[in-house]
């Protein structure tokens, strides 16, 4: 997997690591990817049934992971996830016909909307594709940040950054938006969170400055 990702042009990847093995396996996984020249960041996907569960998990895991994403299973969870600045990415299950990325949610969203292409490529029905195109329409109208990810779990599912960009344009994003969705948007999320986890970080816009930096 690591070699396949490197060969198609990736320089860094986000690894979705279950909480049960975070401390035990994350170092080993990072070493495997580092051997082929890939940087890695840890990611957690939160799936919650209500706002209280989501807030509890955010308090527990925000500082343990580089990227926090939330699956929007219902309107209450979606609204909280879009508003809460601790959430980096929200995504919607294309099989859940009751949940849509609406104009209201777009106005609330502080993070980014993720489109996982494995959901599209693994479906014979056109429903998932139509839903993804509607999401991109809303995102484009409200200038929402978008992340395009391959969601690959095997080498066969790996898609190059260029392929992701092409799919983004097909779904309705502009060339510039599609390029940002596979480069600058995910990069800015990672950089911001790495800074937030730094011992020099106090709060948004405030950090400790050493004497050497003042000279």
Regions found by a protein language model. Give the residues of each.
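Glycine-rich phosphate-binding "P-loop"
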Residues: 37-47
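Active-site mouth loops of central-metabolism enzymes
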Residues: 1, 45-47, 67-71
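Charged catalytic cores and adjacent phosphate/nucleic-acid-binding surfaces used
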Residues: 1-16, 22-36, 52-63, 76-215
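Short beta-strand/loop segments at the ligand-binding rim of alpha/beta enzyme cores
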Residues: 40-42, 62-68
């Amino acid at each position: 997997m690591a070699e396949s990702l490197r060969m198609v042009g990736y320089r860094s990847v986000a690894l979705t690591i279950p909480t049960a093995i975070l401390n035990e396996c994350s170092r080993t996984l990072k070493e495997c990817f580092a051997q082929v020249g890939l940087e890695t960041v840890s990611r957690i996907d939160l799936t919650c049934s209500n706002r209280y569960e989501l807030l509890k998990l955010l308090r527990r895991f925000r500082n343990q992971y580089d990227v926090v994403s939330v699956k929007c299973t219902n309107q209450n969870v979606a609204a909280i996830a879009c508003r809460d600045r601790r959430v980096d990415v929200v995504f919607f299950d294309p099989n859940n016909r009751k949940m849509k990325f609406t104009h209201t949610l777009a106005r609330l969203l502080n993070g980014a909307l993720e489109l996982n292409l494995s959901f599209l490529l693994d479906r014979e029905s056109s429903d998932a594709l139509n839903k993804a195109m509607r999401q991109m329409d809303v995102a484009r109208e409200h200038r929402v940040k978008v992340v395009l990810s391959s969601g690959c779990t095997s080498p066969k599912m790996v898609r190059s950054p260029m392929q992701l960009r092409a799919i983004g344009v097909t779904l309705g994003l502009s060339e510039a938006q599609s390029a940002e969705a596979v480069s600058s948007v995910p990069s800015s999320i990672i950089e911001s969170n790495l800074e937030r986890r730094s011992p020099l970080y106090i709060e948004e816009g405030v950090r400790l400055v050493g004497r050497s930096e003042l000279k």
